[in-house]
Structure formats: structure tokens, C-alpha cells
Swiss-Prot record:
GO function term, MF aspect, one: unfolded protein binding
This protein's UniProt keywords: ATP-binding, Chaperone, Metal-binding, Nucleotide-binding, Zinc
SMART domains: AAA, ClpB_D2-small, zf-C4_ClpX
PROSITE patterns xref list: CLPX_ZB
Transmembrane region(s): none
GO biological process, one term: cell division
GO cellular component, one term: HslUV protease complex
Entry protein name: ATP-dependent Clp protease ATP-binding subunit ClpX
Domain ClpX-type ZB: 2-56
Annotated residues for binding of ATP: 122-129
Subunit note: Component of the ClpX-ClpP complex. Forms a hexameric ring that, in the presence of ATP, binds to fourteen ClpP subunits assembled into a disk-like structure with a central cavity, resembling the structure of eukaryotic proteasomes.
């Protein structure tokens, strides 16, 4: 009897949760016939904390919604020009999220419709940047889809559901967060119908995609395969309600102005034909785009049902030289500021003369690439010096003037020791 009692006293106590004995853990806390170790306590705390954090995220979602004035002011910090479009977007986004926040407070049971947006503007006018900046301000998931890659289900290409799948990826498959996100569909003009006339061949990347996008944009309970539906057909689907997802569609619509000009000038050709033709030439493409109507977009190749899902249409202006100069220097994340920060990492100052900045803007204007072409121009100018600089010593400043931009000379290097200007050739 004595030996058995000694054996029991020597028996090691164990954690009732993980099974580790008292020698394997730092602390072992006893309860009524139950033990828990410090490691399990820490794990339980983490689980509780994660639950609290998740709930807090859901409770705080859109707890603060900036006013249209505040939204536009924020956009002004990052996007140059396009004031009318900024106002349109600010009001549209505010109303969209105000509708979501107050859906339960609607005592009259008036159903507020969703106002998706169509942006029309040339390449490099700021369409994508506007949408990205809005999403960052509101702290909602944001994804970009390319309409040219989309096809009808069953054909080579991406299913339209992939648009929502990308949004889910951005928020780590948190469905509740994804349902409040913004989806930006670029190159929407490229899915226009190939012809006004019915065709015996199926238009799988044009009208077919428009038809497939209809329900998604309007609001539906979509079944989304987390890993893409075509390569993993056996996976479980996530149910995502798209009713509160804001869709912003954008495109250049390069031939649209011609369609509008024909409509406007039809019926005005009786007599004085020559004068009217001269007046028509004076009117810019921008003038005609400002007169856009739904029937013009139908003539372009968008189906009426699709246009109906995009009630807010706004036109972006082509950027002029002054706007491009401002884009290079003024915004918080201006290109020149970005490269100056990059050179600061090497403890070197980077300076552009006013003439150099103007010359860069003129180059981008001649290439007709808008703001998008500015980075490639600067990259080409600085390529050689960025290649050499990490291996160089005692460099104080790099100076870029107009002759450097026009490839007439090399960037000027100013050294610390003698403060002497030298060329990148190492003279």
C-alpha cells in the first residue's frame, strides 16, 4: 500500500488540453480535476483576440465616411486636373456607401438603386489612379480587371467571376469585406459588339461578356471559386453578394467622338455646307464627348442593358502640357519626388531644372501616352546614372537639364570634395 501511494505522488501532472506534463511547460494551473498550461492559455488568448479584432473590423467597417468635399480634396492631393470627374466620383462614391450604411434606417422602405460608374477618357488621363485613390481613402478592397481577357463561360479566357475572385484575394477571402469593395474594369470599350448587325458567329469576347457581366454589376449572389473555376472544378464555392460592390468601368472609346459628331451634325447640312464643315473641324474631340448619350454608346457597341447598369457617365479630359508638368512635381507621390527619394537612399540629391521638366512633358505629349508615358521617359533619362551611381563615391548631386532630356548631353555629376561638375562619362 505504501509503495502505491509513493508511485501516485511521483506521477507527473499533465495539461488537460495539450497533454504536456508539468516538466515540459513553464506553468501549470490547476482547476477542479482539470489542468491548463501557460502555452494553452496563450493560445486561447490569441483566439479570443482574433475574434475580437474580426468583430471590430466588421463593426467599424465604413464607420467614418468622408463627405464629397473631403473626398475631392483627397483626390486633389494625388490627381491633377479632371475637376468635374472628381466631383462626379466624390458624390457617387459617397451616395453608394451612404446607402449601404443606412439601409436598416430606411423607414420608408424606399429601395435605393446602385449607381455604378463609366469613365471615358484617353490613355494616361488618370482613370485608374482615381479609382485606386478612392479605394485607399475608404479603406475598402480594390481590384483591377482587364475586360479584354474576359470571355463567356466555356470559352478560352477568364470567366467574369474572376473579377470578384481577384477582389477576394485582396482581402484574404474575407467575404464580408469583399462585398463592400470596389471593382475597376479597364478597357471596357474593347468588349463592344463587333457589328450592329446580328452575326451567325458567336461574339464570345464582346456582347457575350457584356451579357455575362450584367447580373454581376447589377447585384447577384455569385458563386466564386477561390482558386479559379476552370483549373480546380472540384473546389467549394464562396457565395458573394455583389449588390454592394461598386463597379467602375473605364475605357478610351477612341471612335466614340465620330459617332457623336455624326449625330449632332445630322439634319444641319441644308445649305451653307462649307461653313458647317469648317465649324465641325474647329470643334474638338472633347467637345463631342461631352455631348455623349446612351444611344451613342449603343451605336459604339455596348448593349442597352449594359449601359443601363452604368447610370453615371463622366468624361476625362486629355492632359495638356501644363497638367503634365504639374503631375511631375505637384502630387504627394509625384514622379520626380519618387526618383528624388530613390536617389536619397544613395545619399545623393537629384535635381531637375524647370526647362527639363517642361521638356519631359512635351515628350509625353508628342507620344500621346498621357501621364502613363512620363515614367518611361524619366527611366530612360536616368538609366545610365542609376546603373553607375551605387559604385561611385563622394557624389553630392545629379543635375538634369533640358539638354539631358533631349539626349544632347549626359547628366551632370557634382562631387562633394571639390564641388566640381562632371559628366556621367567620368571625365
Amino acid at each position: 500500500m505504501t509503495d502505491k501511494s509513493k508511485d501516485n505522488s511521483k506521477k507527473l501532472l499533465q495539461c488537460s488540453f495539450c497533454g504536456k506534463n508539468q516538466k515540459e511547460v513553464k506553468k501549470l494551473i490547476a482547476g477542479p480535476a482539470v489542468y491548463i498550461c501557460d502555452e494553452c492559455i496563450r493560445l486561447c488568448n490569441n483566439i479570443i483576440q482574433e475574434t475580437k479584432t474580426t468583430k471590430k473590423i466588421e463593426d467599424d467597417e465604413l464607420s467614418y465616411l468622408p463627405t464629397p468635399h473631403e473626398i475631392k480634396k483627397h483626390l486633389d492631393n494625388y490627381v491633377i486636373g479632371q475637376n468635374h470627374t472628381k466631383k462626379v466620383l466624390s458624390v457617387a462614391v459617397y451616395n453608394h456607401y451612404q446607402r449601404i450604411r443606412n439601409v436598416s434606417k430606411n423607414k420608408d422602405n424606399v429601395e435605393l438603386g446602385k449607381s455604378n460608374i463609366l469613365l471615358i477618357g484617353p490613355t494616361g488621363s488618370g482613370k485608374t489612379l482615381l479609382a485606386e485613390t478612392l479605394a485607399k481613402l475608404l479603406n475598402v478592397p480594390f481590384s483591377i480587371a482587364d475586360a479584354t481577357t474576359l470571355t463567356e463561360a466555356g470559352y478560352v479566357g477568364e470567366d467574369v467571376e474572376n473579377v470578384i475572385q481577384k477582389l477576394l484575394q485582396k482581402c484574404e477571402y474575407n467575404v464580408k469585406k469583399a462585398e463592400l469593395g470596389i471593382v475597376y474594369i479597364d478597357e471596357i470599350d474593347k468588349i463592344s459588339r463587333k457589328s450592329d448587325n446580328p452575326s451567325i458567329t458567336r461574339d464570345v469576347s464582346g456582347e457575350g461578356v457584356q451579357q455575362a457581366l450584367l447580373k454581376l454589376i447589377e447585384g447577384t449572389l455569385a458563386s466564386i471559386p477561390p482558386q479559379g473555376g476552370r483549373k480546380h472544378p472540384q473546389q467549394e464555392f464562396l457565395q458573394v453578394n455583389t449588390a454592394n460592390i461598386l463597379f467602375i468601368c473605364a475605357g478610351a472609346f477612341s471612335e466614340l467622338s465620330k459617332i457623336i459628331s455624326k449625330r449632332i451634325d445630322t439634319g444641319n447640312t441644308i445649305g451653307f455646307n462649307c461653313n458647317l464643315k469648317k465649324q465641325k473641324k474647329k470643334k474638338s474631340e472633347q467637345y463631342f464627348l461631352q455631348q455623349v448619350q446612351s444611344k451613342d454608346l449603343i451605336k459604339f457597341g455596348l448593349i442597352p442593358e449594359f449601359i443601363g447598369r452604368l447610370p453615371i457617365i463622366t468624361i476625362l479630359k486629355e492632359l495638356n502640357e501644363t497638367a503634365l508638368v504639374q503631375i511631375l512635381c505637384k502630387p504627394k507621390n509625384a514622379l520626380i519626388k519618387q526618383y528624388q527619394t530613390l536617389f536619397n537612399l544613395e545619399k545623393v540629391k537629384l535635381e531637375f531644372t524647370k526647362e527639363a521638366v517642361t521638356s519631359i512633358a512635351k515628350k509625353a505629349l508628342s507620344k500621346k501616352t498621357g501621364a502613363r508615358g512620363l515614367r518611361s521617359i524619366i527611366e530612360n533619362i536616368l538609366l545610365d546614372i542609376m546603373y553607375e551611381l551605387p559604385s561611385m563615391k563622394n557624389v553630392e548631386k545629379i543635375l538634369i537639364d533640358e539638354s539631358v532630356v533631349n539626349s544632347h548631353s549626359l547628366p551632370k555629376i557634382i562631387y562633394e570634395e571639390k564641388n566640381k561638375s562632371k559628366k556621367a562619362s567620368g571625365e
